[in-house]
């Protein structure tokens, strides 16, 4: 990434479905730590419907880091515990863009959304013990 390149953030919308699926599949190939059930069988129509539903809720978030109009990272907050009203944060960045502050930018923005716009009471985070990059980011 050159100095002239600027990363922007955008809320994922239904029309981003194909790009989101491509991003998630690429990240899954690069890291094997993205945990999305049935990722390989998700269709663009499925993802469009999911992104539309998320866009009208206050307990879910999908935010994209964009570079030259292409997604290079993603952060999600998904409601995981109805009783506790808790959401789980997940973040992933294409390997080519690691160590450039994109993950930190995404996490900070997700926390801001949680604190200012979310209807969730709690935010939780699970990290694989061997994922030292993620542990460092979240600390």
Positions of predicted regions on the chain:
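Short acidic N-proximal helix/loop "leader" segments that mark the beginning
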Residues: 1-3
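A short beta-loop-alpha structural element at the N-terminal edge
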Residues: 7-22
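Conserved GNAT acetyl-CoA-binding A-motif
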Residues: 86, 114-126
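Acetyl-CoA-dependent GNAT
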Residues: 14, 26-94, 107-108, 113
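Conserved active-site alpha-helix within GNAT-family acetyltransferase domains
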Residues: 100, 104-105, 116, 129-139
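Glycine-rich phosphate-binding loop
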Residues: 97
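Amphipathic alpha-helical recognition patches that constitute DNA-binding helices
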Residues: 19, 88, 133
């Amino acid at each position: 990434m050159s100095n002239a390149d600027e990363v922007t953030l955008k809320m994922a919308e239904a029309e981003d479905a194909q790009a989101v699926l491509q991003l998630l599949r690429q990240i899954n190939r690069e890291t094997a730590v993205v945990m999305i059930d049935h990722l390989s069988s998700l269709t663009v129509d499925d993802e469009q419907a999911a992104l539309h539903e998320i866009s009208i809720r206050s307990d879910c978030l999908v935010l994209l880091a964009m570079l030259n109009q292409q997604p290079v990272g993603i952060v999600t907050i998904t409601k995981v515990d109805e009783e506790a009203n808790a959401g789980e944060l997940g973040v992933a960045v294409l390997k080519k863009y690691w160590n450039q502050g994109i993950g930190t930018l995404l996490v900070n923005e997700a926390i801001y959304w949680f604190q200012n716009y979310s209807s969730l009471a709690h935010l939780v985070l699970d990290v694989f013990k061997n994922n030292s990059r993620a542990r460092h980011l979240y600390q």
